[in-house]
């Protein structure tokens, strides 16, 4: 996954 997507996923978690 892209760093941006990973950041969004981390925000949801």
Curated annotation (Swiss-Prot):
Keywords: Amidation, Amphibian defense peptide, Antibiotic, Antimicrobial, Immunity, Innate immunity, Membrane, Secreted, Target cell membrane, Target membrane. The modification Leucine amide is found at residue 13. GO terms for cellular component: extracellular region; membrane; other organism cell membrane. The keyword Metal-binding does not apply. Expressed by the skin glands. It is found in: Secreted; Target cell membrane. Its main location: secreted. One of its GO terms (biological process) is defense response to bacterium. Antibacterial peptide. Has activity against the Gram-positive bacterium S.aureus (MIC=8 uM) and the Gram-negative bacterium E.coli (MIC=128 uM). Has a moderate hemolytic activity (LC(50)=75 uM). Belongs to the frog skin active peptide (FSAP) family. Temporin subfamily. This is Temporin-1CSa. It comes from Rana cascadae.
